[in-house]
A protein has these predicted regions:
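Short alpha-helix boundary/capping motifs
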Residues: 25, 94-97, 140-141
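Bacterial Sec-exported substrate-binding components of ABC uptake systems
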Residues: 2-7, 12-13, 22-64
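Charged, glycine-enriched surface loops/patches
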Residues: 128-142
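Acidic/histidine-rich, surface-exposed loop or edge segments in extracytoplasmic proteins
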Residues: 40-42, 114, 136
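Second-shell loop/turn segments in exported
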Residues: 46, 52, 117-119, 142
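Residue-level signal for beta-strand positions within conserved beta-sheet cores that form or flank
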Residues: 34, 71, 136
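A short, structured surface patch at a secondary-structure boundary
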Residues: 57-113, 119-121, 125
């Protein structure tokens, strides 16, 4: 199980790094299309309108990766169990008070929509919620 979590963590890290690194490059050519396409763990191609500024992370593993990437200030919503996790208390106290959007087993789509995110990150086990996010034009990666 630990090996599986480590593999998933590394995969999510790769996705997130590719998403954020693309926005960090220097480009002297004016681009009319800042679209970024990422492939999530389900093999879906997800198109983003540039680097996300408002992110919801409903799973502590993806949240910890965002913290390690130094982009926790872009988080607008996190998992419901944040107050019980030592990680937040030690390295990102400011996240504890963000709106709770769900757990690794369920997610509140209405709460997510109210936060007007540029990107929602969910665990793969919540893939049945993807069509609901797509109906609302909210990019989601799993």
């Amino acid at each position: 199980m630990k090996k599986f979590k480590k593999i998933i963590s590394l995969f999510i890290l790769g996705i997130l790094m590719s998403t954020f690194v693309v926005g960090c490059g220097s480009n002297n050519v004016e681009s009319k299309d800042n679209k970024v396409t990422v492939v999530d763990q389900l093999g879906r191609e997800v198109e983003l309108d540039g680097t996300p500024e408002k992110i919801i992370s409903s799973y502590y593993i993806s949240t910890s990766l965002l913290i390690n990437l130094g982009v926790q200030d872009k988080l607008v919503g996190i998992e419901a169990k944040a107050k019980t996790r030592e990680m937040y208390k030690k390295v990102a106290k400011e996240l504890i008070d963000l709106p709770a959007v769900g757990t690794s087993k369920e997610i509140n789509i209405e709460e997510c929509a109210n936060l007007n995110p540029d990107l929602v990150i969910i665990p793969t086990r919540l893939k049945e919620f993807i069509p609901k996010f797509e109906e609302l034009n909210i990019p989601v990666i799993a």
